Amino acid sequence: MQAKKRYLISLLTGAFLVLLIYLGGGGVPGPAAPGSRSRTHGYNRPDQPWPHFSDPLQHFSPWDHSDTEDYNVHISPRQKRDVNSSVYKGKRCRMQSCFDFSLCQRNGFKVYVYPQQKGEKISESYQNILSTIEGSRFYTSDPGQACVFVLSLDTLDRDQLSPQYVHNLKTKVQSLALWNNGRNHLIFNLYSGTWPDYTEDLGFDIGQAMLAKASISTENFRPNFDISIPLFSKEHPRTGGDRGYLKYNTIPPFRKYMLVFKGKRYLTGIGSDTRNALYHVHNAEDVVLLTTCKHGKDWQKHKDARCDKDNAEYDKYDYREMLHNSTFCLVPRGRRLGSFRFLEALQAACVPVMLSNGWELPFSEVIDWNTAAVIGDERLLLQIPSTVRSIHQDKILALRQQTQFLWEAYFSSVEKIVLTTLEIIQDRVLQQSSRSSVMWNSHPGGLFSLPQYSSYLGDLPFFYAKLGIKPSPKFTAVIHAVTPLVSQSQPILKLIVSVARSQYCAQIIVLWNCDKPLPAKQRWPATAVPIIVIEGENKVMSSRFQPYESLISDAVLSLDEDTVLSTTEVDFAFTVWQSFPERIVGYPARSHFWDNNKERWGYTSKWTNDYSMVLTGAAIYHRYYHFLYTHFLPSSLKSMVDQLANCEDILMNFLVSAVTKLPPVKVTQKKQYKETMMGQSSRASRWADPDHFAQRQTCMNKFASWFGGMPLVHSQMRLDPVLFKDQVSILRKKYREIERL
């Protein structure tokens, strides 16, 4: 009897345990997956979200079983790992392990673009990228000379629901003869993944290729291998682009609004958590965060109690007006980590407040975003208003100014985004001559600071003030000679004597671009400074701006052979240049204007109240611009100058103004600077040719087209000696001869 009771009790106990496990076993945690990462450590990192706890309780609102679309579905960690492993099989790729440096050592940093395949569609944005590369100094049409390869297959939009999606890309890429598992290849991408989770799935194995990708996460980003680029719209200009909207600084730097945002709310799904919580910090006064539920075709099926109020308030405000009148602009994540709001805020000089955990910010390898943005945390949304209010006005002003620099240097056009990407890769390849962080984050930026010239900041005129360096105490005169020496009274000989008497002259270089042989050494005047005669190889106009090794001084006095300048005028121009070492300083001024009737740019030599160019027939500038002219400008523009034997001075002014964003500096009232006795048969008489002036009009528009806009800046300033024309004794004046001219 006792045994039967024991058996019965054991049986009931076992049945009860089985029933308990069956009914409640779903809540018992199982062993961790082998590939899962512990979150015990590093819980304060902003790029890791809070742990996700599933709610076993029933929802307060009844579930509508008629909804066939599950907006809150989330793929499992295993599925996410599978997706990432299929896309990032080269997860551990770095330049040292997945890049062949030997391809770059043979021919330098050259980029090859695959020929476009017949029948393949290419989006306008991707065509802009390819056109930029093909028009850059990095491009080569010979794959045997290439260091980096770019696909002609459109990889920008890899959302399977997009009409721009290219099908069968995996097969097409693998069939490329030069693919080599993606080694030394660069892939551009703006959109990846699709509804509902928008994973970073490109739909094909990138192998060992580098990714230039928008909205890339820090989890998938391969440091010093991939490049994070900004998300830009198809309307983003290919070249040029509008300048930043900051016209002047206000002190204190506060605007009408402290913090603004206007955008979609995303009722459900990825990206909705933060945007659904914005109403908690919205006060409709200085913090205006507006969202609308009107997104997608079925938004009304998922609207909540706040939607009607949010939609009504959303329509009351103009987005552009908010953008231009706010101190800070909130940039929360969307469906993907990046959004168009980022570039819009930069251009508007509205300091971005980043609220997108885990986003690798654009060009983070070289740009210090702490100097231009506020990096927030989605989990600390309620602290954002108090955080931005605590920022001192000096810091706000510095942040605002840096947004304008970064926008104009790297983001205002597709061309700048692409060239910045290529320059970053080039710095990795040529580490011995790479740019410093100061070059990337200071005016004029990395695109205009070529490390092939020098990686030392003190060799570039833009950093003299920052480093406390004084400009060069001497100059080198470069005289462009195009007519033979037939008389000892020719203007070039008088010019050499006059320049050589300057106390600041280190040497004189005569660039012999004449068809006649070089004159004998004794034909040149005896001077206290050395005279170096260089015979141009091709005898073309662009040769006057070659970075000759003989240029030992930073300052270059550029002169035409028929220029008439006294020693006093040379001295005064040089002393003025020492105060403006990054600009062109000189005598002959010209201007540009917009012709409304012809709808084109015009060139004028009329004496007006302003000017935008100082011609290089009598001007001083830094020798670095010789290097930029030769190595930065495309061969198409230089070939045009050489064929016309004209416009080289205009092109140099375009280049310097594009770099500095400043006008040149004219000195003294002198307007005529040419020798009138030059023979009409000489090549110098081209100034009297009516076609010469017409050609310069054509050049203006050709140059403006390549620069993507008009870089020239007008000025109404002219610098004269302090006592110029003053009613004092002539003996008290330092540059007394200038008044007699």
UniProtKB/Swiss-Prot annotation:
Molecular function as annotated in GO? acetylglucosaminyltransferase activity; glucuronosyl-N-acetylglucosaminyl-proteoglycan 4-alpha-N-acetylglucosaminyltransferase activity; glucuronosyltransferase activity; metal ion binding; N-acetylglucosaminyl-proteoglycan 4-beta-glucuronosyltransferase activity
Keywords for the protein's UniProt record, in alphabetical order: Disulfide bond, Endoplasmic reticulum, Glycoprotein, Glycosyltransferase, Manganese, Membrane, Metal-binding, Signal-anchor, Transferase, Transmembrane, Transmembrane helix
**Residues engaged in binding UDP-N-acetyl-alpha-D-glucosamine:** 435, 544, 560-562, 648-649, 696
Bilayer topology reads:
Single-pass type II membrane protein
**Which biological process terms from the Gene Ontology are attached to this UniProt entry?**
heparan sulfate proteoglycan biosynthetic process; protein glycosylation
Report the EC code(s) recorded for this entry: 2.4.1.224, 2.4.1.225
- Return the broad EC class: transferase
Catalytic activity annotation: 3-O-{[(1->4)-beta-D-GlcA-(1->4)-alpha-D-GlcNAc](n)-(1->4)-beta-D-GlcA-(1->3)-beta-D-Gal-(1->3)-beta-D-Gal-(1->4)-beta-D-Xyl}-L-seryl-[protein] + UDP-N-acetyl-alpha-D-glucosamine = 3-O-{alpha-D-GlcNAc-[(1->4)-beta-D-GlcA-(1->4)-alpha-D-GlcNAc](n)-(1->4)-beta-D-GlcA-(1->3)-beta-D-Gal-(1->3)-beta-D-Gal-(1->4)-beta-D-Xyl}-L-seryl-[protein] + UDP + H(+); 3-O-{alpha-D-GlcNAc-[(1->4)-beta-D-GlcA-(1->4)-alpha-D-GlcNAc](n)-(1->4)-beta-D-GlcA-(1->3)-beta-D-Gal-(1->3)-beta-D-Gal-(1->4)-beta-D-Xyl}-L-seryl-[protein] + UDP-alpha-D-glucuronate = 3-O-{[(1->4)-beta-D-GlcA-(1->4)-alpha-D-GlcNAc](n+1)-(1->4)-beta-D-GlcA-(1->3)-beta-D-Gal-(1->3)-beta-D-Gal-(1->4)-beta-D-Xyl}-L-seryl-[protein] + UDP + H(+)
Q: Which cofactors go with this protein?
A: Mn(2+)
Top-rank lineage group of the source organism = Eukaryota
Q: Where in the cell is it found?
A: Endoplasmic reticulum membrane
Q: Which cysteines are joined by disulfide bonds?
A: 647-699
Membrane-crossing residues? 8-28
Q: Which GO terms describe its cellular component?
A: endoplasmic reticulum membrane; Golgi apparatus
Q: Which Pfam families match?
A: Exostosin_GT47 (PF03016), Glyco_transf_64 (PF09258)
Which ranges sit in the Lumenal compartment?
29-741
Q: Which Gene3D superfamilies match?
A: Spore Coat Polysaccharide Biosynthesis Protein SpsA, Chain A (3.90.550.10)
Cite the SUPFAM superfamilies for this sequence.
Answer: Nucleotide-diphospho-sugar transferases (SSF53448)
Q: Where does Mn(2+) bind?
A: 562
Matching entries from InterPro entries are given as: Exostosin, Exostosin_GT47, GT64_dom, Nucleotide-diphossugar_trans
Belongs to which family?
Answer: Belongs to the glycosyltransferase 47 family.
Its biological purpose is as follows: Glycosyltransferase required for the biosynthesis of heparan-sulfate.
Q: What is this protein called?
A: Exostosin-1b
Tell me the organism.
Danio rerio (Zebrafish)
